[in-house]
Amino acid sequence: MKPWILGLTGGIGSGKSAVVEQFGRLGVHWVDADHAARWVVEPGKPALARIAEHFGDGVLTPAGELDRAVLRARVFENAGERRWLEQLLHPLIRQEIAEHLSRAQSPYAILVSPLLIEAGQYRQADRVLVVDVPESLQLQRAMRRDQASEAQIRAILKAQASREERLRHADDVLVNDRDRAWLEAEVARLHDFYLTLRGGQP
C-alpha cells in the first residue's frame, strides 16, 4: 500500500528538526523541503544553468555552485525576479519531494517544510502536524541557535505564515515547550496514532 503523507511545519525555533528526527528514529521516512530546494540547483542540474543564464555568472561561485547570498540579494527587493525564480523552482522542488516520498517503505512518510502553508506544499500532504511553541520561547531558541538579534528573528517571523494561519491548517498540534523526554513520548504517541490511519484519515 502506498504510504500516506504527513506534512510537518512550524515557525522558526519551534523545534521541527528535533520532532522529525524523532519520527525518523521510529522508522518513518521523511523528506525536508529545504534539502529538496538545494538538490534542484546542484551543479549539473538544468535549473542552475537557467538561473545563471537569467541572472548572469555573478550568481555562481568560482566552483560553479549557486551563490545563495548573491541570488538572495538580487531577488530580495525585486518582486518580478523573485516571481520568475519561484515559477522556475517551485514545480521542480515539488517533483523532487514527490520522488523522494514515493520511495518510502514506512506506512506513512513525512514532508517537513518551514513553508508548508505559504508555498502551498500542504496540498501534497494528507494530514498536517504543526509544531507550535510560545513566542517568547521561540525567540529565545532561534536567537541562541542562529546567533541573531531579536529584531532579525522578528523579521523572519513576519515573512513566515502567522501562527494563527498555521494552526488553521493543522489536523494535529504538538506544543513543543517541555523537555526532550516529553517530546520523545509525545512523538511516540502520535506515531502510534498515525499507524492506525489510512490515507491520513481515522
UniProtKB/Swiss-Prot annotation:
ATP binds at residues 13-18. InterPro entries: Depp_CoAkinase, P-loop_NTPase. GO terms for cellular component: cytoplasm. Keywords: ATP-binding, Coenzyme A biosynthesis, Cytoplasm, Kinase, Nucleotide-binding, Transferase. One of its GO terms (biological process) is coenzyme A biosynthetic process. Its EC number is 2.7.1.24. Its main location: cytoplasm. It catalyses: 3'-dephospho-CoA + ATP = ADP + CoA + H(+). It is found in: Cytoplasm. Pathway: Cofactor biosynthesis; coenzyme A biosynthesis; CoA from (R)-pantothenate: step 5/5. It is an enzyme of class 2 (transferase). Gene3D superfamilies: P-loop containing nucleotide triphosphate hydrolases. The keyword Signal does not apply. Residues 5-202 form the DPCK domain. GO terms for molecular function: ATP binding; dephospho-CoA kinase activity. Catalyzes the phosphorylation of the 3'-hydroxyl group of dephosphocoenzyme A to form coenzyme A. Belongs to the CoaE family. This is Dephospho-CoA kinase.
